[in-house]
Each structure stands twice: as C-alpha cells, then as structure tokens.
C-alpha cells in the first residue's frame, strides 16, 4: 500500500477527533502566528494562484483567502475534498495525489503545505518533484514540517512507534538532504526553526489527550511563552521548521 493511501485510511479513522482538536480556534491562532506568518513573510498573496496541498479541511486556506489569494485545495481523500468544498465555496477542491496531481505544469504561484510532507515517507522527494513541475518559474513552495536531527525528534520517533494516533510511515523530514537534492532548482529564501510549549499543548492537544474544554484557558499564556522562547530556538531544540523556497 502506498504512503498516501496509508495516511488516508489512518486519517479517516481519526477524522472527527482530529478536526475537533486541530481545527478549533486555539489551534488556528497558533497556526496563524507560528506557521502562516513566517511561511509567507515577504510574499504578497493578493491575487496569487495557490495550492494548499494535502489540504484536509483547509486550515491554511482560511489564512490564504484572508490575504486575497485564490486557492485550490488538493487532497487524495474524496470525503475530505467534499468537506473542503462545503467549507470554502469560493475555492476549489481537487481530489488528487500530490505525487501525481494531474495539474498543468508551470501554472501556480505558490504551493503551501503544513504538516503534510512527513506523512509521505518514503516519497517526500517525489512530492517535491511534482510541486516543482506545477509551480511557475519564480513560484514559491512554503512548508512547515517536523524535522530530523533535533532533540524533540528523538522523542517523537520513540512516541510514533507506540502511539496508535500515528501511522507507520510517519517520519520527520530530512531538510539537509532535501536541500542538497533540490539546490539546483530552488532558491532557499527563508528557514526558521520553531515549536515549543504551545506547539505541543495547544496545536497537538489531541496527541496529549487534553480535553478540549481546557484549551481556551491555557492557550493565551502558552502562546505568549512560545513567542518569548522562539527567537532563541535553533535546529537542535525546535519541534518543526518553516521554509520558504522559490523555483529558479
């Protein structure tokens, strides 16, 4: 079974609980501050043709639309795309794989992925190849993913093997290897290592089995704490990396 199909079946089993935890207002506040703002820094999104790849219900689409982008959501799950189209009628959902999207070459200004690439092992590089194909020259690939070679990843790897919330093929991305492979085709504009207290307990409340009713009470202080710690984080102590690449 291919990596995307494994993830689709896994997600379908946990979809209701997943959306409750990752789609609530507290998690969206986290995304906007620590994913979306650094991912799209310096990019005028107004009027751009954008793909949210592996879109789910469109958590990043919400931000992109607010900035004036025209968004297509791409996901392998037909049920997910139905939900996406219902939630974002001004956008278009396409049921297709990011490994072979069927979309026209050189046709999009930006592709955004939040937490999707690490679900694709061992096919991450194949996804980047497809993204490169559909991006216009000068187009952006913006992504946020758990990364290897960090202390949090050591814990994550131990946890993934023992927690049924994670599929067997989930693995943090090897950013150094990705950059070596694609150095001739992308300019690496931005790279920021982030993720500490609020990432763990606000965004990932489902992983820690935290009751949803508690999140509104502890979210504000943890967001503030994460903002204080973030400027001092590097690769070794961060939970994820935010990258902005540009097609040559």
Residue ranges and their predicted role:
Residues 1-45, 142-165:
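Conserved class I S-adenosyl-L-methionine
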Residues 110-123:
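A short SAM/SAH-binding and catalytic strip from SAM-dependent methyltransferases
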